[in-house]
Every structure is written in C-alpha cells, then in structure tokens.
Amino acid sequence: MPPPASSMGFSDLLNPQNPESTPSTPASKSSAPSTPSTEQSNSNMASSVSLLPPLMKGARPANEEPRQDLPRPYKCPLCDRAFHRLEHQTRHIRTHTGEKPHACQFPGCTKRFSRSDELTRHSRIHNNPNSRRNNKAQHLAAAAAAAAANQDNALASNAASMMPPPSKPITRSAPVSQVGSPDISPPHSFSNYAGHMRSNLGSYARNSDRASSGMDINLLATAASQVERDEHYGFHNGPRGHHIFGSRHHNNNRLPSLSAYAISQNMSRSYSHDEDDMYSHRVKRSRPNSPNSTAPSSPTFSHDSLSPTPDHTPLATPAHSPRLRPLGTSELQLPSIRHLSLHHTPALAPMEPQPEGPNYYSPTQPHVGPSISDIMSKPDGTQRKLPVPQVPKVAVQDLLSPGFTSVSSSASNSVAGGDLADRF
C-alpha cells in the first residue's frame, strides 16, 4: 500500500507542472479495472520515478525524517547549530574562529585550510604536472628558496666580518667603560691599557669627551674623589718638600656628596697592579699642567682600591672594600658612625694601620693589614684595646691633628704603599 500512496503523491505534484499528462491519467484509470497487471507495472514505474529526482538533487527526503529525530549532542558555543558528530562541530567552529590548521606541505606554498578536503583538493594543483599554476608555484618556490639562501649567506658574511673589529676596541676602550659601568670591565683590560696610556694621554682625553651624557655624574664623582685622594697624598708627603701635593690640602671637604656617590659606585673594584701606582703618580704630577686633568684620573681611581700586591691579598668580599667606606665618613666628620662601624668583618682590616713613622711599611709585608701581634705591640694602650681597623680614627693622634685626620693619611698609605712614599 505505501508504494501506491507515494505514486499518487508524486502524480499530484506532477499534475500542475505537466498539463499533457491530464488526459493520460483518466485513461490509466479507465484501463485499471480491465488489466490488473498494468496497474502493478504503473505503480512500480511511479515508485522508481519518484526516487530519481531526490537522487539527482542530492537530497534524501525518505531518510530525512528519521535523521531529524537523531540526537545532536554537539552544539556550537557561538551559534544555535548542533551536530551529530564531534568532527562536524569542530569543522563548524573553525568557520567562526578562522582557524586553518591544514597547511599545504608543498615547498614554497604557504596556503592553509580549515578543512582537510580543501587541502586535498588544493594538493591536486601541485601534483598535476600539466597545470600552469603548478609551474608558476614551482618557480615562486625556487625563487623564495634562492632568496632565503642568499639572505642567510649575507647574514653569515656580515657576522664573520663584524667579529674581528670588536676584539681590538675591547682593551683600548676599557677605561671609558669603567667610568660608566664599574662592574663590567674585565680585570686584565686596564693592565693592557696602562702602558698605552702613558704615551697617549691626549687621545684618552679626546675619547673621554665622546662619552655619553649618562656618565657625567660618574665622571664628576670620580674626579672629586680623585682630587680628595690627591689631597691625602699631598698632606702625607708634604713634609718631604713636595709642594705639588701639599698645595691642595686646603680643599679637604670639597664635594662630599659626589665622593660618597663615587665610593658607592666603585666599591666592587678589586683589581690593582704595581704599575697602576706608578702611573697614578705620573698622572698626578701632570695634573696642574693638563687642561683635561679629570679625564686621565678616572681609571686610576677605579683601580687604587686594593693593595699593590694582589697575589697576597685577594679580598673575598670586594663589594665591602674597607678602604673606600671609611674615606667618606672621615671627611664628613661623623664620629658616631665610626664608632658604630667598629664591629665590621675582618675584611675591613686594611683600614686599621696608622702611620707612626717612616718604618711603618716594609715591601715584604703582606697588605692584608696588621696582625694581632702588631696590634698588641702598639705603645699606646688605647690602640691595643681596639682590634677593629677603624679604631685609629678616634685615637689621640687623630684628635690632635687640627686640619687633617689620620684616617685619611692611613688610608692613603694603605692604598699607595710605603714603597711609593720612599720613591719621593
């Protein structure tokens, strides 16, 4: 019974479209009671014809009703559509997000697709040898590969050509970098540059003028601190007849804030050599006659923070260098701070010695500071009671000196060394 119903429904649909079939319909009806076999053949033909249009159109009306009843658990979170399968939902979501995970694997092709069937259809373009697009794509891919290879070669050649030049300025421009960044320069850079500086002071002065404006504070601070250190040397060596250094001792408290800043910036300097001390005095002798006297003095100050015998005195904590810390406190005349600093670690030992005469320092004595036996051998009882290096700053000799503190002279003596005083 269902086939006749479907055939009748199909005939009803065809009646308005085909008016010529109207006379044939009654003829078939009139012949139906006479020939039952004809009715069966007509019904079979009608059922077969009814299936042709859906198959040709790609639709399935017979299976569409049960398909609508199937559950659609996979719903799109961005719209109201739902899907029977997860891969269908994933493919649909890519239409919202624009994601294209399927990339063409052909060399030189950068196209991507959101569906795998689109990628398959696109890959046929590359696989077809007779396609014009394939030939064009191959040419473009070859050109892109050649350009990339040329670019890589150019970068490699540029890198190879740029490598040798930095090796030379590293050692020659080290003192300029030490002024701006005191913690970066290697320890051997200044020793290589010191011999070159002796004959090229003018060139260094010109190079220092090219420094960036960010180093102005460091230059001022190092210059002020170097002037103060020269004053200490001049006062200590003044009785020996050197008026060049003794003439500056009246500027004792000049720029204390800059000196404190320079001390904080250069606390981590822990490299020094014997030739550094010799060169520092040459610079100091030429300071009154040099118009750019502050430029050559900056590298010497950055390396005078240790004794001239680095093989015997490697400080474990160069950031807490004792020679630089009490220098600013003694100039600011803060006895309370000096009393508080009596309990520093033994790394502060080099600040303790106080010059009592020309026989205080011997070249063979290690520059670590006086031992306990040296402290106990002091004639003054107050000095024996205070084992910390900064004790001599509040000693009687320090209080008796009106215009200069013994701590500064002791600090300068510990930095320069007794053998340096004997040279004068």
Curated annotation (Swiss-Prot):
Modifications made to the protein after synthesis: Ubiquitinated. Deubiquitinated by creB, probably to control its activity or amount.
Comp. bias regions, Low complexity: 21-38, 288-302, 406-416
GO biological process, one term: carbon catabolite repression of transcription from RNA polymerase II promoter by glucose
Cross-referenced InterPro entries: creA/MIG_C2H2-ZnF, Znf_C2H2_sf, Znf_C2H2_type
UniProt feature, compositional bias: Basic and acidic residues: 62-72
Subcellular compartments: Nucleus
Span of zinc fingers (C2H2-type): 74-96, 102-126
Region (Disordered), start-end ranges: 1-74, 115-134, 161-184, 269-327, 347-386, 403-424
Main location: nucleus
Cellular component GO terms held in the UniProt record: cytoplasm; nucleus
Residue stretches of biased makeup (Polar residues): 39-50
Pfam families for the chain: zf-C2H2
UniProt keyword list: DNA-binding, Metal-binding, Nucleus, Repeat, Repressor, Transcription, Transcription regulation, Ubl conjugation, Zinc, Zinc-finger
Assembly description: Interacts with creB.
Family statement: Belongs to the creA/MIG C2H2-type zinc-finger protein family.
Protein's UniProt name: Probable DNA-binding protein creA
Gene designation per UniProt: creA
